[in-house]
């Protein structure tokens, strides 16, 4: 079974969490793209979705699901999104698709966060995947210096502008033993908009696709 087939299988499993939901949150990425495509069969009961990126918004519109403003939608019942890494505590690194800030906002606005991943994303310790940090452009060099002081090796993701008009620094060589503390420390750096550690608001449910089937992280 290919990695793409695993992603589709775990996306199918997530449908069970949205069958009775009228307005849901939808994330960004290749696994979520499968989930959005599968929503086409359920869209009769879905009144709208709050999306974390322009790319997901366009995909939702193509299957006829209205995209809503979070300010109007209020609290969401369920948010479905993928992750670049996830640990046993359901804490994640996200932001490989540069949508981390909006993903974190929609996750915070949701009662239940369902994370869908294939088994390659499961890790014991976060940090092998470079940690994305969204930064206001004028602060890029300042933030990079502060990230070096934290032990990381930041690399500017050139030719990438977020939906919010900011830039991304991908921080390599971090071993994240205390995700909550690191999330707070990076957020405290002036110029940082958001970082891709999702520990203060971890997932509530993690669905993992593998060749033997889909399992739920206990």
Swiss-Prot record:
Coiled coil: none
Pathway: Carbohydrate degradation; pentose phosphate pathway; D-ribose 5-phosphate from D-ribulose 5-phosphate (non-oxidative stage): step 1/1
GO molecular function: ribose-5-phosphate isomerase activity
Record: residues binding substrate: 28-31, 81-84, 94-97, 121
Matching CDD domains: RPI_A
Gene3D superfamilies: 3.30.70.260, 3.40.50.1360
Signal sequence, renumbered to the chain: none
Reaction it catalyzes: aldehydo-D-ribose 5-phosphate = D-ribulose 5-phosphate
Top-tier EC class: isomerase
Alphabetically ordered keywords of this record: Isomerase
Superkingdom assignment: Bacteria
GO biological process: D-ribose metabolic process; pentose-phosphate shunt, non-oxidative branch
Record-stated family: Belongs to the ribose 5-phosphate isomerase family.
Function recorded in the entry: Catalyzes the reversible conversion of ribose-5-phosphate to ribulose 5-phosphate.
HAMAP family per the UniProt record, alphabetical: Rib_5P_isom_A (MF_00170)
Protein name: Ribose-5-phosphate isomerase A
């Amino acid at each position: 079974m290919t990695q793409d087939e695993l992603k589709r299988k775990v996306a199918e499993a997530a449908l069970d969490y949205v069958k009775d939901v009228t307005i849901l949150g939808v994330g960004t990425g290749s696994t979520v793209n499968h989930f959005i495509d599968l929503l086409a069969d359920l869209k009769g009961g879905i009144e709208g979705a709050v999306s974390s990126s322009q790319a997901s918004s366009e995909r939702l519109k193509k299957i006829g699901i209205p995209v809503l403003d979070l300010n109007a939608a209020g609290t969401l019942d369920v948010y479905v999104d993928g992750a670049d890494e996830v640990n046993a505590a359901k804490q994640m690194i996200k932001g490989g698709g540069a949508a981390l800030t909006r993903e974190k906002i929609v996750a915070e606005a949701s009662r239940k966060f369902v994370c869908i991943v294939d088994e390659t994303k499961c890790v014991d310790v976060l940090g092998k995947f470079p940690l994305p940090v969204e930064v206001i452009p004028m602060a890029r060099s300042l933030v990079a210096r502060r990230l070096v002081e934290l032990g990381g090796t930041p690399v500017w993701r050139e030719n990438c502008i977020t939906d919010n008009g900011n830039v991304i620094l991908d921080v390599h060589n971090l071993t994240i033993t205390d995700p909550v503390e690191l999330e707070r420390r990076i957020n405290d750096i002036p110029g940082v908009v958001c970082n891709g550690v999702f520990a203060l608001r971890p997932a509530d449910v993690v669905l993992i696709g593998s060749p033997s089937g889909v399992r739920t992280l206990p």
